[in-house]
Protein backbone atom coordinates (compact mmCIF):
# COMPACT_ATOMS: atom_id res chain seq x y z
CA UNK A 1 0.00 0.00 0.00
CA UNK A 2 1.48 3.43 -0.93
CA UNK A 3 2.30 5.76 1.93
CA UNK A 4 0.17 8.86 2.33
CA UNK A 5 2.10 12.07 2.92
CA UNK A 6 0.65 14.36 5.54
CA UNK A 7 0.40 18.01 4.47
CA UNK A 8 -1.34 19.80 7.37
CA UNK A 9 0.27 23.27 6.98
CA UNK A 10 -1.62 24.64 9.99
CA UNK A 11 -0.11 27.11 12.44
CA UNK A 12 0.77 25.38 15.72
CA UNK A 13 2.71 26.36 18.85
CA UNK A 14 6.37 25.41 18.52
CA UNK A 15 8.22 23.12 20.88
CA UNK A 16 11.91 23.30 21.74
CA UNK A 17 12.31 20.23 19.49
CA UNK A 18 11.29 22.45 16.53
CA UNK A 19 14.31 24.74 16.93
CA UNK A 20 16.63 22.78 14.58
CA UNK A 21 13.88 22.82 11.94
CA UNK A 22 13.36 26.58 12.37
CA UNK A 23 17.11 27.16 12.04
CA UNK A 24 17.13 25.03 8.87
CA UNK A 25 14.21 27.08 7.47
CA UNK A 26 16.04 30.35 8.13
CA UNK A 27 19.20 28.93 6.52
CA UNK A 28 17.15 28.06 3.40
CA UNK A 29 15.77 31.61 3.20
CA UNK A 30 19.24 33.08 3.73
CA UNK A 31 20.55 30.89 0.89
CA UNK A 32 17.68 32.04 -1.35
CA UNK A 33 18.70 35.67 -0.77
CA UNK A 34 22.42 34.82 -0.92
CA UNK A 35 22.97 36.06 2.63
CA UNK A 36 25.96 34.99 4.71
CA UNK A 37 24.73 32.38 7.21
CA UNK A 38 26.16 32.04 10.72
CA UNK A 39 23.65 30.64 13.20
CA UNK A 40 25.66 31.80 16.22
CA UNK A 41 25.27 35.44 15.20
CA UNK A 42 21.97 35.26 13.30
CA UNK A 43 19.74 33.29 15.70
CA UNK A 44 20.96 33.68 19.31
CA UNK A 45 17.33 33.93 20.45
CA UNK A 46 16.59 30.48 19.02
CA UNK A 47 19.67 29.05 20.72
CA UNK A 48 18.10 30.26 24.01
CA UNK A 49 14.54 29.35 22.95
CA UNK A 50 12.96 28.91 26.39
CA UNK A 51 14.32 32.23 27.67
CA UNK A 52 12.82 34.16 24.74
CA UNK A 53 9.72 32.28 23.63
CA UNK A 54 8.13 30.55 26.63
CA UNK A 55 5.08 32.04 28.32
CA UNK A 56 4.70 34.53 29.80
CA UNK A 57 7.78 36.03 28.07
CA UNK A 58 6.76 35.11 24.54
CA UNK A 59 5.49 32.51 22.10
CA UNK A 60 6.65 30.83 18.92
CA UNK A 61 4.58 29.26 16.14
CA UNK A 62 5.45 27.02 13.22
CA UNK A 63 3.90 25.56 10.09
CA UNK A 64 4.94 22.00 9.29
CA UNK A 65 4.67 20.00 6.09
CA UNK A 66 5.28 16.27 6.46
CA UNK A 67 6.98 16.92 9.78
CA UNK A 68 9.36 19.55 8.36
CA UNK A 69 9.20 23.17 9.58
CA UNK A 70 8.29 25.32 6.55
CA UNK A 71 7.07 28.45 8.33
CA UNK A 72 7.83 30.25 11.58
CA UNK A 73 7.17 33.33 13.67
CA UNK A 74 7.98 34.37 17.22
CA UNK A 75 6.85 37.10 19.57
CA UNK A 76 8.62 38.41 22.64
CA UNK A 77 7.19 40.68 25.31
CA UNK A 78 8.94 44.04 25.67
CA UNK A 79 8.50 47.02 27.96
CA UNK A 80 5.06 48.08 29.09
CA UNK A 81 2.36 46.60 26.85
CA UNK A 82 4.60 46.20 23.80
CA UNK A 83 5.86 43.06 22.07
CA UNK A 84 8.20 42.44 19.15
CA UNK A 85 7.51 40.04 16.29
CA UNK A 86 10.53 37.95 15.26
CA UNK A 87 11.47 35.26 12.75
CA UNK A 88 8.62 35.40 10.20
CA UNK A 89 9.96 33.02 7.57
CA UNK A 90 8.27 30.82 4.97
CA UNK A 91 9.67 28.48 2.37
CA UNK A 92 9.50 30.18 -1.04
CA UNK A 93 6.85 27.81 -2.44
CA UNK A 94 4.41 28.72 0.36
CA UNK A 95 4.53 32.51 0.08
CA UNK A 96 1.47 34.33 -1.17
CA UNK A 97 -0.92 31.61 0.02
CA UNK A 98 -2.08 33.14 3.31
CA UNK A 99 0.27 31.25 5.60
CA UNK A 100 2.31 34.33 6.46
CA UNK A 101 -0.93 36.09 7.39
CA UNK A 102 -1.97 33.11 9.52
CA UNK A 103 1.37 33.20 11.36
CA UNK A 104 1.06 36.95 12.06
CA UNK A 105 -2.56 36.44 13.16
CA UNK A 106 -1.36 33.82 15.68
CA UNK A 107 1.02 36.45 17.10
CA UNK A 108 -1.79 39.03 17.27
CA UNK A 109 -4.04 36.54 19.12
CA UNK A 110 -1.25 35.83 21.61
CA UNK A 111 -0.74 39.59 22.11
CA UNK A 112 -4.43 40.17 22.77
CA UNK A 113 -4.59 37.27 25.24
CA UNK A 114 -1.44 38.59 26.96
CA UNK A 115 -2.63 42.18 27.33
CA UNK A 116 -0.21 43.51 24.71
CA UNK A 117 -1.43 46.68 23.03
CA UNK A 118 1.37 47.44 20.59
CA UNK A 119 3.41 45.24 18.25
CA UNK A 120 6.69 46.18 16.53
CA UNK A 121 9.09 44.39 14.20
CA UNK A 122 12.24 44.94 12.17
CA UNK A 123 12.52 43.49 8.67
CA UNK A 124 15.36 43.40 6.15
CA UNK A 125 14.65 45.90 3.36
CA UNK A 126 15.00 43.10 0.79
CA UNK A 127 11.93 41.19 2.04
CA UNK A 128 9.41 42.99 -0.19
CA UNK A 129 6.69 40.33 0.06
CA UNK A 130 6.80 40.47 3.85
CA UNK A 131 6.56 44.27 3.80
CA UNK A 132 3.47 44.11 1.60
CA UNK A 133 1.91 41.61 4.02
CA UNK A 134 2.68 43.78 7.05
CA UNK A 135 1.18 46.83 5.38
CA UNK A 136 -1.97 44.91 4.36
CA UNK A 137 -2.28 43.85 8.01
CA UNK A 138 -2.20 47.43 9.30
CA UNK A 139 1.48 47.85 10.16
CA UNK A 140 3.10 51.23 9.48
CA UNK A 141 6.73 51.65 8.44
CA UNK A 142 8.24 54.12 10.88
CA UNK A 143 12.02 54.18 10.39
CA UNK A 144 15.05 52.44 8.93
CA UNK A 145 18.43 51.44 10.34
CA UNK A 146 21.69 49.90 9.17
CA UNK A 147 23.17 47.03 11.18
CA UNK A 148 26.78 47.99 11.82
CA UNK A 149 29.32 45.27 11.09
CA UNK A 150 26.75 42.95 9.52
CA UNK A 151 28.29 40.77 6.76
CA UNK A 152 24.99 40.93 4.84
CA UNK A 153 25.03 44.75 4.82
CA UNK A 154 21.56 44.65 6.31
CA UNK A 155 19.32 47.66 6.32
CA UNK A 156 16.06 47.13 8.19
CA UNK A 157 12.67 48.79 8.29
CA UNK A 158 10.77 49.13 11.53
CA UNK A 159 7.05 48.44 11.40
CA UNK A 160 4.48 48.89 14.14
CA UNK A 161 0.78 48.68 14.80
CA UNK A 162 -1.70 48.73 17.61
CA UNK A 163 -2.84 45.22 18.41
CA UNK A 164 -6.48 46.20 18.88
CA UNK A 165 -9.41 43.84 18.49
CA UNK A 166 -9.57 41.21 15.78
CA UNK A 167 -10.31 42.75 12.39
CA UNK A 168 -13.03 41.03 10.40
CA UNK A 169 -13.15 40.86 6.65
CA UNK A 170 -15.65 43.24 5.00
CA UNK A 171 -19.08 41.70 5.16
CA UNK A 172 -18.08 39.38 8.01
CA UNK A 173 -20.17 38.99 11.17
CA UNK A 174 -20.77 42.37 12.76
CA UNK A 175 -19.28 44.36 9.87
CA UNK A 176 -20.83 47.76 9.20
CA UNK A 177 -20.58 50.25 6.39
CA UNK A 178 -19.79 53.98 6.64
CA UNK A 179 -23.39 54.71 7.67
CA UNK A 180 -23.12 52.32 10.60
CA UNK A 181 -25.57 49.91 9.00
CA UNK A 182 -24.63 46.22 8.84
CA UNK A 183 -23.05 45.03 5.59
CA UNK A 184 -24.45 42.07 3.75
CA UNK A 185 -27.99 41.04 2.90
CA UNK A 186 -30.78 42.33 5.10
CA UNK A 187 -31.93 40.02 7.85
CA UNK A 188 -35.43 38.58 7.47
CA UNK A 189 -37.94 40.94 9.04
CA UNK A 190 -35.48 43.84 9.13
Which residue stretches match the model-derived regions?
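Conserved SAM-binding loop
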Residues: 11, 96, 120-123
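Short coil/turn segments at alpha/beta junctions that flank glycine-rich nucleotide-binding fingerprints
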Residues: 97, 114-117
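C-terminal "cap" of GNAT-fold acetyltransferases
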Residues: 47, 117-190
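Acetyl-CoA-dependent GNAT
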Residues: 5, 9, 13-87, 91-93, ...
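Active-site acidic-Proline motif in GNAT/NAT acetyltransferases
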Residues: 91-97, 125-126
Amino acid sequence: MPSVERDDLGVVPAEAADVPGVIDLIARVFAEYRFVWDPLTEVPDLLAFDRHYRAPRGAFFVVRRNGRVVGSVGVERGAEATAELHRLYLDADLRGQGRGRALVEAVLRWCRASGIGHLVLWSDTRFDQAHALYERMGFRRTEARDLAGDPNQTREYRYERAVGPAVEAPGGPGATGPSGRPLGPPRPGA
